[in-house]
């Protein structure tokens, strides 16, 4: 590949890199009335150059000197591109563990799950169970004499169930992903199904919450999505510059016990493993909030240079066809030192929110999440389950309203979409106690 890098330099490029990627993907989906199986192999190259301080980018299924010339001939921009350059490095890595199962074994495992889902509750009307895995080989080369070779795999399982009793319709879901082997070998699927069953029962019999502002206990799954959606996206440098956080850099936005980071990898089966990003940058911890102070943002090479911040390794692309974007990896709130019982102390009327079903945030810092498992709290005790719960608020106000952080920790994993690109991400945290949060229903 370096001969093509050299060709770009001979043509006047001040920087060039090439990514090669080969992905073997397998998918099995089973619903109440059909089965769908697919396979695919996707393979190709991306070429990127800086020429006259403009970007050039091209995706191709083959690489030749003509492709290099064509990339330079189609540069775009405003002649302001500046990036962080890195020292020479050659590395070969193995990411996670292999998936040693054939197609028949995967289909049989999914049929077993489907038969169990059918018996979770008599009110179930439909379900969708999707298994997906991929085996990948990636290579990265740059004009800095960087060569990074990576092999790995990932597998995921998503289960969506719809149940109806009378005029009450509920939807519950569970998503798991791992890079530590075959997902049925990594997780206790019986526990996953038990969680779904509990949510179906609670949603069907649950009451809607009384709208208003209340003290709230957020469980790790909800803390994870809050950290990802309300903090993480606003801390991606390309979003940050137009959002509410940029002007608050190096200022206090929470108590000194508040710490939020994004890591390339964690010691957890649901961790995403991003040791190098798609710009060949080594991943490092990004201390977004440290002891309550907003410290730094996730960057790619361009925004690292723009902000004067060391590169973080957050440039990720869905495939070789895509220009890399600033994306999260493992975004989480660090545990505190309180027990779970301490968090509930003193709550006369409030809510305990356990599992989200979706969420979104805006660049001005407002967020809203739907909750699929939650309970009313009265006099520090967990009471009846609820359904159709929604929470909303402002990111900075909510951070400042965190009163206590527990010492436990949990992670969730899934997929995040940004500008049409989807990548695997993970998030998590402990239980937290929020002094006041807006709670309501959703339809």
Curated annotation (Swiss-Prot):
Q: Which domain of life is it from?
A: Archaea
In terms of temperature dependence, the annotation states: Optimum temperature is 55-65 degrees Celsius.
Q: How does activity depend on pH?
A: Optimum pH is 7.0.
**Which keywords does the record carry?**
Hydrolase, Metalloprotease, Protease
Biological process terms from the Gene Ontology for this record are: proteolysis
Known EC number: 3.4.-.-
Q: Which GO terms describe its cellular component?
A: cytosol
InterPro entries linked? Metalloprtase-TldD/E_C, Metalloprtase-TldD/E_cen_dom, Metalloprtase-TldD/E_N, Peptidase_U62_metallo, TldD, TldD/PmbA_N, TldD/PmbA_sf, Zinc_metalloprotease_TldD
Transmembrane residue ranges: none
- Coiled-coil positions: none
Instruction: Please describe, based on the UniProt annotation, the reported consequence of changing residue 233 to Y.
Output: Abolishes metalloprotease activity. Does not affect homodimerization
Q: Which SUPFAM superfamilies match?
A: Putative modulator of DNA gyrase, PmbA/TldD
Q: Give the PANTHER family listed for this entry.
A: METALLOPROTEASE SLR0863, UNCHARACTERIZED PROTEIN TLDD AND PMBA
Protein family (similarity comment): Belongs to the peptidase U62 family.
NCBIfam families on file: Arch_mtprotase_TldD (NF040952)
Quaternary arrangement and interactors, per the entry?
Answer: Homodimer.
Q: What does this protein do?
A: Zinc metalloprotease. Able to degrade azocasein in vitro.
Q: What is this protein called?
A: Zinc metalloprotease TldD homolog
**What organism is this sequence from?**
Saccharolobus solfataricus (strain ATCC 35092 / DSM 1617 / JCM 11322 / P2) (Sulfolobus solfataricus)
């Amino acid at each position: 590949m370096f001969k093509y890098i050299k060709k770009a330099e001979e043509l006047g490029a001040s920087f060039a890199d090439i990514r090669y990627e080969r992905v073997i993907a397998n998918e099995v989906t089973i619903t109440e009335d059909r089965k769908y199986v697919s396979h695919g192999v996707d393979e190709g190259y991306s070429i990127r150059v800086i020429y006259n301080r403009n970007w050039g980018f091209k995706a191709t299924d083959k690489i030749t000197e003509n492709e290099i010339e064509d990339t330079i001939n189609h540069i775009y921009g405003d002649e302001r591109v500046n990036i962080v350059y890195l020292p020479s490095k050659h590395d070969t890595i193995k990411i996670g563990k292999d998936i040693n199962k054939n197609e028949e074994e995967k289909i049989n495992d999914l049929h077993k799950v489907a038969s169990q889902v059918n018996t979770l509750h008599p009110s179930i009307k439909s379900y969708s169970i999707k298994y997906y895995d991929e085996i990948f080989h990636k290579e990265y080369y740059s004009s800095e004499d960087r060569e990074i070779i990576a092999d790995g795999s990932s597998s995921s399982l998503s289960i969506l169930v719809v149940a109806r009793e009378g005029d009450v319709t509920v939807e519950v879901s569970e998503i798991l992903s791992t890079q530590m082997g075959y997902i049925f070998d990594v997780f206790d699927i019986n526990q996953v199904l038990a969680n779904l069953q509990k949510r179906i029962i609670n949603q069907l019999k649950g009451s809607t919450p009384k709208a208003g502002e209340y003290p709230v206990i957020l469980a790790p799954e909800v803390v994870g999505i809050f950290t990802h959606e309300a903090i993480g996206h606003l801390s991606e440098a390309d979003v940050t510059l137009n959002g509410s956080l940029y002007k608050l850099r190096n200022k206090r936005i929470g108590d000194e016990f508040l710490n939020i980071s994004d890591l390339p990898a964690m010691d957890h089966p649901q961790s995403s493993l991003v040791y190098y990003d798609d710009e060949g940058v080594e991943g490092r911890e990004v201390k977004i909030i440290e002891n309550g102070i907003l410290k730094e943002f996730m960057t790619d090479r361009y925004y690292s240079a723009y902000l004067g911040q060391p590169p973080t390794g957050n440039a990720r692309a869905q495939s070789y066809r895509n220009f890399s974007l600033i994306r999260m990896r493992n975004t989480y709130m660090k545990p505190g030192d309180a027990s779970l019982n301490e968090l509930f102390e003193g709550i006369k009327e409030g809510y305990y929110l356990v599992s989200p079903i979706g969420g979104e945030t805006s660049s001005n810092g407002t967020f809203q999440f739907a909750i699929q498992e939650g309970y009313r709290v009265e006099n520090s005790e967990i009471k009846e389950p609820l359904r159709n719960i929604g929470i909303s608020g402002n990111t900075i106000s909510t951070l400042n309203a965190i009163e206590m952080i527990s010492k436990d920790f949990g992670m969730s994993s899934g997929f995040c979409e940004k500008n049409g690109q989807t990548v695997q991400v993970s998030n998590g945290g402990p239980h937290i106690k929020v002094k006041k949060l807006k709670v309501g229903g959703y339809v």
